[in-house]
Amino acid sequence: MSEKYVVTWDMLQIHARKLAQRLLPADQWKGIIAVSRGGLVPSALLARELGIRHVDTVCISSYDHDNQREMKVLKRAEGDGEGFIVIDDLVDTGGTAKAIRDMYPKAHFVTIFAKPAGKPLVDDYVIDIPQDTWIEQPWDMGVVFVPPLSGR
């Protein structure tokens, strides 16, 4: 990845609210299925905005820090997804998204961020990201002191 896109907590909350607005009315949904781990925080934000209490997870491992590797389903929510929102933080190459579509063909699959290769696999997203860009999510970062340039 040649570029980085840094996401702050504030940005994430703003984008999640935009996505939640598009998912109204809330009473059309039975619940939310979060794709672990990237979709966990966005699912909490959507659940709050939409007043949804039924939140489940599908646990798929497809990244090893910044490298994609073999995909493995560790846990899945029951059913075909009918009446459920499935959320992940982003759709990248589409590998995870294809697995989600196979598991939950009737779900409404959304992400906050979408890269060109994966975009056709989601029903909705908020932000376009170039394919060669790595997204730094706020839960992966910490605040660090940076000394002044003058050294004083």
UniProtKB/Swiss-Prot annotation:
Its EC number is 2.4.2.-, 2.4.2.22. Its cofactor is Mg(2+). Guanine binds at residues 92, 135. This is Xanthine-guanine phosphoribosyltransferase. The keyword ATP-binding does not apply. Xanthine binds at residues 92, 135. It is a peripheral membrane protein. GMP binds at residues 69, 92-96, 134-135. Coiled coil: none annotated. GO terms for cellular component: cytosol; plasma membrane. PANTHER family: XANTHINE PHOSPHORIBOSYLTRANSFERASE, XANTHINE-GUANINE PHOSPHORIBOSYLTRANSFERASE. It comes from the Bacteria. Pathway: Purine metabolism; GMP biosynthesis via salvage pathway; GMP from guanine: step 1/1; Purine metabolism; XMP biosynthesis via salvage pathway; XMP from xanthine: step 1/1. GO terms for molecular function: guanine phosphoribosyltransferase activity; hypoxanthine phosphoribosyltransferase activity; magnesium ion binding; xanthine phosphoribosyltransferase activity. GO terms for biological process: GMP salvage; IMP salvage; purine ribonucleoside salvage; XMP salvage. It catalyses: GMP + diphosphate = guanine + 5-phospho-alpha-D-ribose 1-diphosphate; XMP + diphosphate = xanthine + 5-phospho-alpha-D-ribose 1-diphosphate; IMP + diphosphate = hypoxanthine + 5-phospho-alpha-D-ribose 1-diphosphate. 5-phospho-alpha-D-ribose 1-diphosphate binds at residues 37-38, 69, 88-96. InterPro entries: PRibTrfase_dom, PRTase-like, Xanthine_Guanine_PRibTrfase. Homotetramer. The gene is gpt. It is an enzyme of class 2 (transferase). It comes from Pectobacterium carotovorum subsp. carotovorum (strain PC1). Signal peptide: none annotated. Keywords: Cell inner membrane, Cell membrane, Glycosyltransferase, Magnesium, Membrane, Metal-binding, Purine salvage, Transferase. Its main location: membrane. Purine salvage pathway enzyme that catalyzes the transfer of the ribosyl-5-phosphate group from 5-phospho-alpha-D-ribose 1-diphosphate (PRPP) to the N9 position of the 6-oxopurines guanine and xanthine to form the corresponding ribonucleotides GMP (guanosine 5'-monophosphate) and XMP (xanthosine 5'-monophosphate), with the release of PPi. To a lesser extent, also acts on hypoxanthine.
